[in-house]
Amino acid sequence: MVASARVQKLVRRYKLAIATALAILLLQGLVVWSFSGLEEDEAGEKGRQRKPRPLDPGEGSKDTDSSAGRRGSTGRRHGRWRGRAESPGVPVAKVVRAVTSRQRASRRVPPAPPPEAPGRQNLSGAAAGEALVGAAGFPPHGDTGSVEGAPQPTDNGFTPKCEIVGKDALSALARASTKQCQQEIANVVCLHQAGSLMPKAVPRHCQLTGKMSPGIQWDESQAQQPMDGPPVRIAYMLVVHGRAIRQLKRLLKAVYHEQHFFYIHVDKRSNYLHREVVELAQGYDNVRVTPWRMVTIWGGASLLTMYLRSMRDLLEVPGWAWDFFINLSATDYPTRTNEELVAFLSKNRDKNFLKSHGRDNSRFIKKQGLDRLFHECDSHMWRLGERQIPAGIVVDGGSDWFVLTRSFVEYVVYTDDPLVAQLRQFYTYTLLPAESFFHTVLENSLACETLVDNNLRVTNWNRKLGCKCQYKHIVDWCGCSPNDFKPQDFLRLQQVSRPTFFARKFESTVNQEVLEILDFHLYGSYPPGTPALKAYWENTYDAADGPSGLSDVMLTAYTAFARLSLHHAATAAPPMGTPLCRFEPRGLPSSVHLYFYDDHFQGYLVTQAAQPSAQGPAEMLEMWLMPQGSLKLLGRSDQASRLQSLEVGTDWDPKERLFRNFGGLLGPLDEPVAVQRWARGPNLTATVVWIDPTYVVATSYDITVDTETEVTQYKPPLSRPLRPGPWTVRLLQFWEPLGETRFLVLPLTFNRKLPLRKDDASWLHAGPPHNEYMEQSFQGLSSILNLPQPELAEEAAQRHTQLTGPALEAWTDRELSSFWSVAGLCAIGPSPCPSLEPCRLTSWSSLSPDPKSELGPVKADGRLR
């Protein structure tokens, strides 16, 4: 009783405090319930057909001079409203949910469910203990699949030889896109589970303990000192892909010497580049192209296979008596002259130069994923489970760019030593094998004392930008990639005491000025008046590849560009020449190039066969289409002065902070990203509003920009198809404008590479169901934004959904002409049209002179540059 009375007394005394505490707890509970309800609601719409469980996230970032980062993972996202901001060294700017939206669940249209993924049940063979297929019995590695996105689930159509239980292996089987790849994965996993895939122990021949890595300094005066023996000769292995033939020619021009040898492997997917390289090699006896080609994906086992096969080829070419093997990519460039490199290697002719990770081995093994089993198929590296490092050896690794002696290459290629044979088996199922195989073989061999911990390169690592898991669509791991050099990085290229002779990476589509600076530093300036020193061209389409490599958006845009240009030729011609300047396009464009000047994108160059309206043969014309800027900076406050640019596009590259889709060509099925660039200044919170062509407010969200934030970007999860036509993105603060930009969602004239049919146009050009781009409606913002009444725009949009043929082309051309203008036309051959000058005489045509990327004959000193 006494205790009860005391409790009652305490309750009466502190009843106000207790009531306040209960109220706070109740409020917190309501908030938690509200947000969990939003997540559950989204999960109910998006999660009914769940994909296989994501891979477990790893931790940490990339190792020094190694491309591996951490285990791949999609990571969990809490709802749809997490955005990203990029700001090195400062907290991430946040995208927060706008409070101006209202829920409209009653009219929500759920997306079509994805294909049913295979179950995660155990997979068993026909009988336990059935004999396993040996490694030699595997099907060949498939060339199918795409590195543009992770392979999609398919039905199980294979027969595993054992019970597969590991979660990594089951996930890989569920995601592999072909039966052949699934069978390969099952065979590898069964062999591994039986203990017959990986070597248990590997012999070590090196008698040294610890790492043998003598430091070698470099003094430029050494290049003038007499050599010990004849100057060394180098076999350059160039591993290239993509379409940047002009940058490759520029690299070859810089490193070429008639005493060296050049062997070029072009990725199997890069047919245009292969044709150009084959033509290039015909002019030089010491330049050859591999007669075979492979698909070499980032981090894949195929890269090591390609190197070993290339090394064997180089050893067996008659008359190629080389001393060193140096691998390069098209994004490399020399930082010292050939004379300096030859002098240095001649004084160290018995050394092998490989860059090590520079940290304890156990951590490197974890970061690099060496304790995990991988297999490559469908152009993807699949993580299949854990494994043990073989006993008896020291595992090393780091960079996959190296300088190796001929004797070591012969040992790796020809030896029967169990050390090499068993390590080749181990690295066949290893992520990034070229970053570790040669290091580990050398450090455990009798030649271990020849190792120098320096690969003679300087690499532009910026891990805050380069380690963003950008390869997770190719490998089940998080990887890193170096950044491109820019002029502000030039001091890093001038290593004085450390011997470095090459640098990477360089991309002329990102920055060509730094190459000009480096080239001038090495070889001096070009003669005065040399053309095209600031210009750069890169092919993006060639008719020999066929239209299959083009998206419907690009095919639509390129053909529309040709029509706009030919119309311009007729209207811009002098009156007397008008009949001679009327053309009709014939077929599809024959080629398309990106054109840059002074490191700014200048537009597309389209080469098109055109039939004159007057009598005469068809002519080949090249047309220059230039994008028109649409950014408006509207604010007058200090916060508004922070905004530098506002862009919308696709293929955003967070490492280089640019859109790889130059010009922002996008269609109804694309997923655009809005990117803002900021100067430093006071913190601010801004609202981003997207408005479609019929004045539907598609979405609205807030971004918080910290003091030192440089870039913010967010891709709203808009329902598709997007309505074709001009869109507007506004940036506001307290509903006062800071900036505005317009972008075009292009009406498509092609669908699956065929002219658009009416039944396809009726849904592809109609916008999303019920005009709802999000699960919430933002149309209540129309009055705040002072948007026009939508009725007329809606009627026009409805008419547009019925267009096909010439009427559809006219609409597409009309919309495109609001964002692009014809900047030039020229004739590749003779033309009676007086307003068309020859392309070779222009400064902008892809056929105009480009001396910096033209090779020419070998000079008296054995060089090209």
From Swiss-Prot:
Glycans are attached at N122, N327, N683. The keyword S-adenosyl-L-methionine does not apply. Keywords: Disulfide bond, Glycoprotein, Glycosyltransferase, Golgi apparatus, Magnesium, Manganese, Membrane, Metal-binding, Secreted, Signal-anchor, Transferase, Transmembrane, Transmembrane helix. It is an enzyme of class 2 (transferase). The chain crosses the membrane at residues 16-36. Its EC number is 2.4.2.26. It is found in: Golgi apparatus membrane; Secreted. Residues 73-82 have a biased composition (Basic residues). It is a single-pass type II membrane protein. Residues 37-865 are lumenal. Residues 53-65 have a biased composition (Basic and acidic residues). Contains disulfide bonds. GO terms for cellular component: extracellular space; Golgi membrane. Active with either Mg(2+) or Mn(2+), but activity is highest when both are present. Residues 125-137 have a biased composition (Low complexity). It comes from the Eukaryota. One of its GO terms (biological process) is heparan sulfate proteoglycan biosynthetic process. UDP-alpha-D-xylose binds at V239, D267, T296, I297, W298, D400, W401, S481, R504, K505. Catalyzes the first step in the biosynthesis of chondroitin sulfate, heparan sulfate and dermatan sulfate proteoglycans, such as DCN. Transfers D-xylose from UDP-D-xylose to specific serine residues of the core protein. Belongs to the glycosyltransferase 14 family. XylT subfamily. Monomer. This is Xylosyltransferase 2. It comes from Pan troglodytes.
